[in-house]
A protein has these predicted regions:
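Terminal low-complexity/disordered tails
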Residues: 116, 126-186
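Activity-critical C-terminal alpha-helical subdomain
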Residues: 28-143
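Hydrophobic, Leu/Ile/Phe/Ala-enriched alpha-helical segments that form helix-helix packing faces
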Residues: 11-16, 79-83, 176, 180-183
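RecA-like P-loop NTPase motor core
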Residues: 1-34
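Generic hydrophobic secondary-structure signal
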Residues: 26-27, 54, 63-73, 103, ...
Length: 186
């Protein structure tokens, strides 16, 4: 649960430290910075946090032991390397920007398209597809304001309309299959 920053900064480090091998993090495609991972051994200790931010947009938070208010720097750097290596292996991205985009582009009915087309939208709005789904939920429930449960219900209905053989689903299955074949998840 949570957005990509919460997942990456808080959840992933915990799983990395206990070496969970049954997890793959599949994040929204718009979070992919498309930077090729470097060898962890080539990153200076002083650059570990900057590298995390460069690749993932946030620090992957680790908790090293310490005493008298000082953390154990050697342990801290070892854990940062472990977490970064884990992230390089376990973080993958959807083959589209957001799930909302996929639903709007692949799962709307003609009448829903009419509702969306009746409004003026800015293609520069980062919340474009979320706002369009909210509008559809407002029409579905005939309400000015809809809550998260109502939006989620509409998203579930739209998801049920998606065909199993969509190219996007084939790409997702390939990501998961490769992760299994390469031992990234077991």
């Amino acid at each position: 649960p949570g957005g990509s920053e919460t997942i990456l900064s808080k959840h992933l480090p915990s799983y990395a430290v206990v070496e969970r091998n049954d997890i793959l993090f599949l994040l929204d495609g718009d979070k992919n910075k498309k930077i090729k991972p470097v060898r962890i051994s080539e990153i200076a200790d002083a650059d570990l946090v900057n590298t995390m931010c460069k690749y993932y947009g946030c620090e992957l938070i680790i908790n090293a032991s310490g005493s008298n208010g000082k953390k154990n720097e050697q342990e801290s750097n070892r854990l940062k390397r472990q977490v970064l290596e884990y992230a390089f292996n376990k973080v993958k991205y959807l083959p589209f920007d957001t799930p909302e985009q996929l639903l709007i582009e692949k799962a709307i009915t003609p009448s829903e398209k009419e509702i969306i087309d009746s409004q003026t939208w800015s293609s520069n709005d980062p919340e474009l597809y979320k706002n369009q789904i909210r509008l559809l939920a407002q029409h579905l429930y005939d309400k000015e304001e809809v809550n998260a449960e109502e939006i989620f219900c509409l998203q579930q209905m739209m998801t049920a309309r998606l065909k199993n053989e969509l190219p996007e689903f084939i790409k997702i299955r390939k990501i998961i299959t490769q992760a299994l074949d390469r031992g990234i998840i077991r």
